[in-house]
Amino acid sequence: MSDVSGVAFGVFIFFFLLVTVLGFAAARWRRAEALDHLDEWGLGGRSFGTFIAWFLIGGDLYTAYTFVAVPALLYAGSAIGFFAVPYTIVVYPLIFLFLPRLWSVSHRHGYVTPADFVQGRYDSRPLALVVALTGILATMPYIALQLVGIEAVLKAMGILGEWPIIIAFGILAAYTYSSGLRAPALIAFVKDTLIYLTIIVAVIVIPSKLGGWDAIFGAAEEKFTPGPGVILPATGQLGYATLALGSALALFLYPHSITGVLAASNRDVLKRNMSALPLYSLALGLIALLGYMAIAAGTKPIGTDANTIVPVLFQEMFPSWFAGIAF
């Protein structure tokens, strides 16, 4: 581990320990009489207001892998990687049509999961079991992608091997088991605040060091002109559109997405959040452009792992302590 990586790793460890303490302390935050009821443990007592729900749902949807992989896609494959931005914009008008109704029915009948809803509405345990198993199977690769994002960050700091990832996942699982949904809700405050801080600093500092946005887009155009080009060719537009639309239709079918929705205290909380959550999409659009910034800066990934391009870019552009905050 280099000295630079050592400083970044030290700051990273500080924030990791901070969120670990917050995760275990979350059981006492907005404390109920007991967490042994599924409503309290799994949905935070269905008591989250607009502010908390905004951080929780945003933190659930815009994950570590999202912020690592989307710029990596733009770095490696030009415009196709930008699909994540329109799909996270289109999704909110779509779900505005049915999520408030889903919340009302679930609140009235005490449903905690999508499988509970299906069993209650269709009186079919086999169908509810299929929905539950589908959710579990769909979530497994989703979790794996988050671990890939963590691995990319650790690799940039010179930390190799599987044990650091296993330990981090084990600690996360432990405080989630202990505190229920209150843990990710409380941690989302810290995580998302750091994300917005990092984005604001990055889009100001990095372009100023690289000669402005004109130089950044010029470097991207120079790289991709011999190949697919910065703009999608006509043959790729249908695939781009269907990828974005399909992703939007699927996003709130994931169990963790529905959990954040059902934890809201009332329908109006959801309506306000559907209006405010696109702020995360704006942030994602700026983060995606980090891929083009890496091209302009001449940044190279570690080995063949394009997912490391953003962590490496931050190590090159910022002091080690700020890189640690970003990580």
Model-predicted regions and their roles:
Residues 1-11, 76-87, 154-163, 186, ...:
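Interfacial loop-to-helix junctions that mark the boundaries of transmembrane helices
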Residues 2-3, 73-77, 101-105, 148-156, ...:
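Membrane-water interface regions at transmembrane-helix termini and the short interhelical loops
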Residues 6-9, 47-50, 122-129, 158-167, ...:
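Membrane-interfacial loop-to-helix junctions in multi-pass transporters
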Residues 20-34, 99, 139, 143-147, ...:
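Hydrophobic alpha-helical segments and their helix-loop junctions in multi-pass secondary transporters
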Residues 50, 119-128, 191-205, 278-283:
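Small-residue-rich segments of transmembrane alpha-helices in multi-pass membrane proteins
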Residues 82-179, 246-250:
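Helix-loop-helix module between adjacent transmembrane segments
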